[in-house]
Amino acid sequence: MPEAPTAKTAPAYGYAPGAHAEALEFIEHVTANAGQVQRRVLGEILAQNAPAEYLRRYGIPGSPDVVDAFRRLVPLVTYEGLQPDILRIANGDTSPIFSGKPISEFLTSSGTSGGERKLMPTIADEMNRRSLLYSLLMPVMSQSVSGLDKGKAMYLLFVKAESRTPGGLAARPVLTSYYRSRQFLDRPRDPYTSYTSPDEAILCVDSYQSMYAQLLCGLVHRADVLRVGAVFASGFLRAIHFLEKHWARLCHDIRTGELDPEITDRVVRDAVGRVLRADPALADAIEDECARASWEGIIRRLWPRTKYIDVIVTGTMSQYIPTLEFYGGGLPLTCTMYASSECYFGLNLNPMCKPSDVAYTLIPTMCYYEFLPVNCNNATAEASHRDLVDLVDVKLGHEYELVVTTYSGLYRYRVGDVLRVAGFKNKAPMFSFVRRQNVALSVDSDKTDETELHAAVSGAVQHLAPFGASLVEYTSYADAATIPGHYVLFWELRAGSTAVPASVFEECCLSVEEALNSVYRQGRACDRSIGPLEIRVVAEGTFDKLMDYAISRGASINQYKAPRCVRPGPVVELLDARVQGKYFSPKCPKWSPGNKQWNKSKDLVGKGDA
């Protein structure tokens, strides 16, 4: 069968033009033969991981037909079911628990368990699969957009804080792992992977210095930029907001050819110094655009050759589409790839489609896919694995939860993404992203569910007790109108005998933040990708008005209960019209790298072995 170029020759975002046909042929082959490829992938995974303790528990190795045994015997599993074994590895156990190959590092998920990032064990070979998927992006995009090899890409990419487990393995986000890999740093010279950002700026852990250096280099290369982007829409908008605040300083650097002294990282200064030259005319041109009263269309005005904005705008990121369209001035928004910490999955074969039409084709070589119909009775993992549907057997228009078995050693793992079948590429389905299971609030990579939010609010309202006040009802929404976005809580209170000071409401804001998960707190305290949490106190009777509105729209009065999360629109307008006070968290919540659950690993392992 034809193969896409190996990771040793595949650059991060595409090939030289001569290899595009080979990449497209690879996509055509694996999608046309999706069923056969999937059977081969499952066989390879089970053969590679035959020594794994996890598979031995279910009697898979040694069975006459391991694939049949896997289908019959291995149950569905969530992260919580794997956590005792994961913590064994984190604590230094090097035995083959999940994989026949050594665990090379942990990838920290944006999803959380017990308030901490989930730790996804991975093997070194997985980096080659990720690189292969990246290598397919430009061949696909070049079918829709020509001339992308005639200039540069301004991608704003960042690393995040990482830590070491007690056993010495790195624990870091999947993109941080990729940007630090030899596959990214040693990528061959290629006209499709010419970036404005120096690697040194991307790898700078100081987010301010990294952002400043990357934007400065992007402005210096203004005339050459053909595409702009970031991973998430929220991250790209943070960059625009940063530019709004600092464009005068950036123009000064370009005018003088001298980098701002606040950029103190020597490696970054040296890298930018190789790009920056005094150019008063360029500084004047940028200044003229940035000094205008309106920033509508600023992307197209600052980078006039840009053909599209490459960011994720599916799922919760769709809330940023209007703002992106304002700044983009009509530039297409492209979604190119579907991936997670567990595994990289697929790509959008029609990347220039409207955001509402984005559908991802799952590449059958990446892992073994199964799908759990969202309407089936899946209350227990033991029963629900019998309801799983193979990749080639899903039905158009139906919704499924994604379940994966990976080379790294996840077996029938519930990713938590709900997907809808939107069409087919040959025998391989194309999926639109519907939602993340059990997520109430999200403005960046954070994911907060209703249970976590309720516990945080319940703790925070204790600050009101000395004043005789109590919480009648509350709801929340993710406000994407601010940059960065932030959580808003609407509280209706029963007043006490003493007025509650503003400082107490601010303490309530901080208390909620302190009780939220580590991904949220990192976004607030370290990455500054989330703004201060806000409490809006509404007038008495507001939630009665909200119920009246819901009933007028067809809700049952017998079954109605106040929603814990609402979306921008008429409901938020109703709530905002009755706001009596607004209060913000006065400082960032505490956060530090690492995982508090590592200290509990022995207890958890004991429970898991029982």
From Swiss-Prot:
Record key words, sorted: Ligase
Record carries keyword Protein biosynthesis: no
Function: May catalyze the synthesis of indole-3-acetic acid (IAA)-amino acid conjugates, providing a mechanism for the plant to cope with the presence of excess auxin.
Protein name as it appears in the record: Probable indole-3-acetic acid-amido synthetase GH3.1
EC top class, as a word: ligase
Organism expressing this protein natively: Oryza sativa subsp. japonica (Rice)
Any one GO biological process: response to light stimulus
InterPro entries (UniProt xref): GH3, GH3_C, GH3_M
